[in-house]
Design a protein with these regions (language model features):
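ABC-type nucleotide-binding domain
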Residues: 1-243
Length: 243
């Protein structure tokens, strides 16, 4: 798998039953690129994420990873090389530390990594710091704290590709800014795809994919889309009103 295109959609069509949700979608994402996907509810954003994660295969067309068809790529390869953070994440019973190193237990100096990316102080809110017990499914921490820990866990796993599916939706602004700064540092050489809902996430992306009614209607940086793409202009105006 030496192709510089980490991910390529080639005329992808996909349906849930009789409902077509993606229509002839084509794009490529280079290794190491930071991509945001935007669009209204039902535009096809999460379906793209699920195809990247190989939860599904396309009905027509193909999804390629480094030049190899998703039909040939094993689930084992996908689990080893692609990390996923949904909007509602879960934690394992045990300490925060054990949750953070779960996907990379042997290859990480946790405190050093957290210090280098500027989030170690965040854990001082807990009486026992990184040794704090989170409880079954993270019952002892808030929803926002649970999501922050899950986001860091995925980033620290150091997969080649990482998909965030509206993963910062439950975070307060301070925590979201902390995780965005952390991902900028930790994901310097990884390919990341963010299904975005806040302006800060969108603007910082290298390129933004604009979905509308299951079709890709724009794929460029924020400045160019804001100038030339009517759908993006409407989305951006709506976000400005909300925020």
């Amino acid at each position: 798998m030496q192709n510089n295109n980490a991910i390529e959609f080639d005329k992808v069509n996909f349906s849930y039953g009789r409902e077509r949700v993606l229509h002839d979608v084509s794009f490529s994402i280079n290794k190491g690129e930071k991509i945001a996907i935007v669009g209204e509810t039902g535009a096809g954003k999460s379906t793209i994420a699920k195809l990247i994660l190989r939860f599904y295969l396309p009905n027509e067309g193909d999804v390629n990873f480094y030049g190899e068809s998703s039909r040939q790529v094993s689930q084992k390869w996908a689990r080893k090389n692609i990390a996923y953070v949904p909007q509602e994440s879960f934690l394992f019973r045990g300490s925060i530390k054990n949750n953070l190193i779960y996907s990379n237990p042997e290859g990480i100096n946790l405190e050093q990594e957290l210090q280098e990316i500027g989030v170690l102080d965040w854990f001082e809110r807990y009486e026992n710091g990184l040794d704090q017990e989170v409880g079954e499914r993270g019952a002892n921490v808030s929803a926002g704290e649970r999501q922050f820990i899950a986001l860091l866990r995925a980033v620290l796993a150091k997969r080649e590709i990482i998909v965030f599916d509206e993963a910062t939706a439950n975070l307060d602004i301070e925590s979201e800014n902390s995780i965005l700064d952390a991902t900028d540092t930790l994901l310097a050489y990884q390919t990341s795809i963010v299904i975005a809902h806040r302006l800060e996430t969108i603007i910082n992306a290298e390129k933004i994919m604009v979905m509308h009614d299951g079709k890709l209607v724009g794929f460029d940086n924020h400045k160019n889309l804001l100038k030339d793409n009517e759908i993006y202009q409407e989305l951006f105006s709506a976000w400005n009103l909300v925020n």
